[in-house]
């Protein structure tokens, strides 16, 4: 089984509805959803602010390629058009980190891969408060491998420029889970 940390964001149209479409599209795979944050756009493109959240999901039959295909399918379903890098989008679904679990062992191992279409963990996640703040909100023990070393997400945030953190503002918006099965623990280390 794999557990994935997904960063979802939108800054076109009904931003909350696009985020909700991603959560709904993942269905019972969803383990946890962070609060929704209003965030300053990342990159040099002038555009509307984003709504961002983090979703943690389990996929008994999923590997990293299957998660990537699922993320791209969610984006296509939202009418995502790939244009300008870091430009506006209806829905952005990024794989941040993926963990492989085995029935024979306790805990999980972070998947590290560098392929032409997928690098895990996400190579810029540690630089993005709009990823780390929501992730920390749903998993206070979260760790991310950076430069070959596991680092606590709270520590990465503490080391970030204050202006980067200040660009991530908690909203009163919420994403709803449609769950037909019981909730599971969030931290992959506790499975």
From Swiss-Prot:
Catalytic activity: 6-hydroxymethyl-7,8-dihydropterin + ATP = (7,8-dihydropterin-6-yl)methyl diphosphate + AMP + H(+)
Source organism of this protein record: Mycobacterium leprae (strain TN)
Family per similarity comment: Belongs to the HPPK family.
CDD domains assigned to the protein according to its UniProt record, in alphabetical order: HPPK (cd00483)
GO BP term (any one): folic acid biosynthetic process
Protein role: Catalyzes the transfer of pyrophosphate from adenosine triphosphate (ATP) to 6-hydroxymethyl-7,8-dihydropterin, an enzymatic step in folate biosynthesis pathway.
EC number: 2.7.6.3
Molecular function GO terms recorded: 2-amino-4-hydroxy-6-hydroxymethyldihydropteridine diphosphokinase activity; ATP binding; kinase activity
Pathway recorded for this protein: Cofactor biosynthesis; tetrahydrofolate biosynthesis; 2-amino-4-hydroxy-6-hydroxymethyl-7,8-dihydropteridine diphosphate from 7,8-dihydroneopterin triphosphate: step 4/4
Keyword set includes Transmembrane: no
Broadest EC class assigned to this enzyme: transferase
Protein name (Swiss-Prot/TrEMBL): 2-amino-4-hydroxy-6-hydroxymethyldihydropteridine pyrophosphokinase
Keywords for this protein: ATP-binding, Folate biosynthesis, Kinase, Nucleotide-binding, Transferase
Keyword check for Kinase: yes
Gene3D superfamilies tied to this protein: 7,8-Dihydro-6-hydroxymethylpterin-pyrophosphokinase HPPK
């Amino acid at each position: 089984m794999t557990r994935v940390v997904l960063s979802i964001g939108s800054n076109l149209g009904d931003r909350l509805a696009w985020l909700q479409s991603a959560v709904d599209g993942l269905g019972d795979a969803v383990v946890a959803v962070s609060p929704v944050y209003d965030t300053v756009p990342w990159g040099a493109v002038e555009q509307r602010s984003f709504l961002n959240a983090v979703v943690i999901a389990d996929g008994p039959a999923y590997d990293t390629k299957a998660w990537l295909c699922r993320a791209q399918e969610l984006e296509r379903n939202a009418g995502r058009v790939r244009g300008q890098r870091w430009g506006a989008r209806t829905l952005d679904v990024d794989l941040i980190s993926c963990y492989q679990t085995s029935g024979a062992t306790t805990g999980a191992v972070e998947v590290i891969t560098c392929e032409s279409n997928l690098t895990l963990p996400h190579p810029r996640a540690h630089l993005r408060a709009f990823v780390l703040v929501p992730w920390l909100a749903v998993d206070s023990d979260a760790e991310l491998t950076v430069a070959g070393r596991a680092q606590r997400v709270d520590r990465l945030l503490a080391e970030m420029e204050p202006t980067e953190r200040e660009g991530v503002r908690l909203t009163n918006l919420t994403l709803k889970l449609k769950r037909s099965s019981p909730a599971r623990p969030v931290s992959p280390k506790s499975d």
